[in-house]
């Protein structure tokens, strides 16, 4: 959904992902929006404050958390996905006047991240020092996210933390903050 002047989704946005056929292991199933640079304050009710994933979330307490979008990215030597928040009930991205957008879970919690990078930005660079943040904000909201596994060496993601090849639904309500 893209609107130039004013965004208004009166009821809710419901997207269902139904995998068919053979496909590779996916990192996430969801939607991504590009938002104006002014909406730089990220607040969420869910797991935090550190980034967390399906297989690494027990150390992240459920609560109301707040930070800048830049603070959500974790500088690993090799750029990779980071900043994910699990079990999000609602989030806001706001400017200095506390105006912006709010996203609420409708049926079930969702995963989310707000970064100054797209997935393509992260995966095309081999060193963190070469990464250039975008001024705009990339808001990802997901029905399912792949666990991290052992990332660097050894076994990958355990089967129970992989994205199951079944129907996944993201049901959210987007409104003005």
Predicted regions and their residues:
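Beta-strand/loop-rich accessory regions of lumenal/periplasmic or secreted enzymes
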Residues: 3-6, 10-177
């Amino acid at each position: 959904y893209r609107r130039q002047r004013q965004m208004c989704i009166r009821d809710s946005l419901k997207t269902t992902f139904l995998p068919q056929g053979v496909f590779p292991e996916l990192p996430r199933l969801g939607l991504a929006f590009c938002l104006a640079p002014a909406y730089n304050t990220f607040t969420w009710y869910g797991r935090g404050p550190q980034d967390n994933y399906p297989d690494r979330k027990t150390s992240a307490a459920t609560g109301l958390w707040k930070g800048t979008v830049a603070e959500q990215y974790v500088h690993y030597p090799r750029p990779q996905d980071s900043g994910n928040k699990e079990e999000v009930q609602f989030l806001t991205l706001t400017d200095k006047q506390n105006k912006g957008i709010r996203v609420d879970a409708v049926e079930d919690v969702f995963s989310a991240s707000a970064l100054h990078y797209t997935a393509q930005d992260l995966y095309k660079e081999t060193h963190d020092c070469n990464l250039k943040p975008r001024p705009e904000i990339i808001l990802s909201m997901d029905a399912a996210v792949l666990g991290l596994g052992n990332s660097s060496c050894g076994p990958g993601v355990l089967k129970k933390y992989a994205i199951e090849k079944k129907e996944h639904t993201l049901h959210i309500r987007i409104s003005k903050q």
